[in-house]
Amino acid sequence: MRQTGLASLPLKSLAVAVLLSLAGTPALAADIPANVDGARIIAADKEPGNWMSTGRTYDEQRYSPLKQISDQNVGQLGLAWSYKLDLDRGVEATPIVVDGAMYTTGPFSVVYALDARDGRLIWKYDPQSDRHRAGEACCDAVNRGVAVWKGKVYVGVLDGRLEAIDAKTGQRAWSVDTRADHKRSYTITGAPRVVNGKVVIGNGGAEFGVRGYVTAYDAETGKEAWRFYTVPGDPKLPPEGKGMEIAAKTWFGDAYVEQGGGGTAWDSFAYDPELNLLYIGVGNGSLWDPKWRSQAKGDNLFLSSIVAVNADTGEYVWHYQTTPGDAWDYTATQHMILAELPIDGKPRKVLMQAPKNGFFYVIDRATGELLSAKGIVPQSWTKGMDMKTGRPILDEENAAYWKNGKRNLVTPAFWGAHDWQPMSYNPDTGLVYIPAHIMSAYYEHIPEAPKRNPFKSMYQLGLRTGMMPEGAEGLLEMAKSWSGKLIAWDPVKQQAAWEVPYVTIFNGGTLSTAGNLVFEGSADGRVIAYAADTGEKLWEQPAASGVMAAPVTYSVDGEQYVTFMAGWGGAFSTFAGALSLRAGVQPYAQVLTYKLGGTAKLQEPAPRPDTPKPPALSNDTASIEAGAKLYDGYCSQCHGIHAVSGGVLPDLRKLTPEKHQMFLGILFGGRVPDGMPSFADAFTPEQVDQIHQYLIKRAHDLHQEGDTWKQFSAKSSH
């Protein structure tokens, strides 16, 4: 049942929650389920059986003191239970576990409350996300999880709402629309954090042209407490606070006002209770090309920056910019970890981050001073770090595409050396465990200033990037050039202690434990445990799908469990579908929970249907070429470049005869339950036919190249 309005609802209303078998469930064992507050999170080590915040603790270390499962017995792990999610798309959530109840999310921000002992559903809450707006999300209809506080569960909804749910009943308590401008493509995929009674959430949308900000809301009522903008607005208007006074001086011209400027804080936060500082990871610019965004001038603060603000007021305190004047989608939204490290023989309270640009940063978290920075993967865009200025040294010949007149092959590329998949820190080993990428892509300046496209589901990048060969052999060669690895990084020595290779990128986030273990899922469909000190693989089982999310561990009734959220999807398998086929998996979304001696059976997806024979190929090459351009501009971000899908959304080369007959109706009518908008305002019937003819041509290519496509899947031997 759809809920409307922003007011609190009566408790007797069930919203869209499903209540099952409430009597005797662990969620009701406590007087108030999910009864978490700041003091409890700060003292989390006193109750290590719970996982009460996204990173377990405010320092976001993703380290658990539990050690019933250890390097001595992890080989005895077996599946304890599984729970099948409703929709097979990308799964990125970190579950929250409190007092025997698990709270997690699936695609389109659906929230599940499960019995952490056996996976029984307690309730399910569907926020009825406006699914036709899924095309306004850059990277699939994903969600990275919830927050809990004093009996409420908080979720950011894909369409821009923040909602509070009663943890006992699954009913909506309040809802707020976080969007500052409904004409812009704002979305939410990140997990909220709750600090000092305030729910903090950012947003996504920089690829579509928005202005980024972070907002804090009263956890009890949903009333806005403060908002911090990450990039300046109209220079004709007064700046919003000290932060924007500083930032405005680093932007030039006024093109960014129409473009939005970007700087969305779509994922990472951390909090230091002693300093009362909230750390915000800020994203890329709108547009990507700095010439069209800011006349190729200025640092464009606070793009690609870590910003510290007062947690109570949202007032600016300090910033450190990882990539001044970002031009490559080198966000600083990646996971931040707070720790105390020995630096030059003295203990320092630091913030650590491995953002997309390939450096690993150690920063004084009180002042923002850069203490050290080293590259964790090959970097063609920079010649190193100037420690006197704290700025990377740009390699203009190999990366400054907006002024060197070249199509530059840049490493790392837009999904970075490390993306949203969380890293973890183990204070016992002193190592940070990073799910890293090795990838390159072309960036090319366009000679004319781009005009904003009014169609809200269209990328607004201001350059050419992501170019790939069309033929299967060229795509296979490119796919083999992208790889992943798990890096155990020593943040004091700034060097790798050990590494484990993977066949492709987008492997899962990591969890480390006092049992000398590191857990990680892989893109090619495995869940794995390594020895935290040496990297030796100690345990592995199939996961029935790719695993991108970070696992958690908890205990109930004295028994330790490890949970992975499995489900292939996200940006890699949509936009770069052909390259993602290296993983050799299909989307199959489920919660997988393991314990010592577990004997449950893994659920597997059904085999894919055979590829239909395509209709007759048109000899109208002009229409096919026109259709290719339209497809590239409007369709590739979801269905894949060159119409090669990674399997999360339909591969349009494999349409059935019925779908070919319905093609015009599908594009003009949309498929809202699946997240596909109507394109009636974007295309004429003639243009739809051109796209259709192009897809038929690509279907014929598929049949001719069939043997090569069979070589794409390459499961890792590790």
UniProtKB/Swiss-Prot annotation:
Per UniProt, heme c binds at: C635, C638, H639, M676
Ligand binding (pyrroloquinoline quinone): E92, R144, T189, G205, A206, T264, K356, D419, W420, A571
Which terms are listed as keywords in the entry?
A: Calcium, Disulfide bond, Heme, Iron, Metal-binding, Oxidoreductase, Periplasm, PQQ, Signal
Q: What does this protein do?
A: Catalyzes the dye-linked oxidation of primary alcohols to the corresponding aldehydes and the (subsequent) oxidation of the aldehydes to carboxylic acids. Active with primary alcohols, glycerol, 1,2-propanediol, 1,3-propanediol but not with methanol or sugar alcohols such as D-sorbitol.
Q: Which CDD domains match?
A: PQQ_ADH_II
- Residue ranges of every copy of the Cytochrome c domain listed in the record: 622-699
Q: Name one GO cellular component term.
A: periplasmic space
Q: How is its activity regulated?
A: Exhibits higher affinity for 1-butanol compared to 1,2-propanediol but inhibited by 10 mM 1-butanol.
Q: Which family does it belong to?
A: Belongs to the bacterial PQQ dehydrogenase family.
Q: List the disulfide bonds.
A: C138-C139
Tell me the cofactors it needs.
pyrroloquinoline quinone; Ca(2+); heme c
- SMART domains assigned to the protein according to its UniProt record, in alphabetical order: PQQ (SM00564)
InterPro entries, alphabetically? Cyt_c-like_dom (IPR009056), Cyt_c-like_dom_sf (IPR036909), PQQ_b-propeller_rpt (IPR018391), PQQ_MeOH/EtOH_DH (IPR017512), PQQ_rpt_dom (IPR002372), Quinoprotein_ADH-like_sf (IPR011047)
Q: Where is the signal peptide?
A: 1-29
User: Which EC numbers does the record give?
Assistant: 1.1.9.1
The record's induction entry says: (S+)-propane-1,2-diol is the most effective whereas (R-)-propane-1,2-diol, ethanediol and glycerol are weaker inducers.
A GO BP term here is: electron transport chain
Primary localization: periplasm
This chain belongs to the protein called: Quinohemoprotein alcohol dehydrogenase ADH-IIG
Positions annotated as active site in the UniProt record? D329
On whether Hydrolase is a keyword of this UniProt record, the answer is no
Q: How is the cofactor bound?
A: Binds 1 PQQ group per subunit. PQQ is inserted between disulfide Cys-138-Cys-139 and the plane of Trp-266. Binds 1 Ca(2+) ion per subunit.
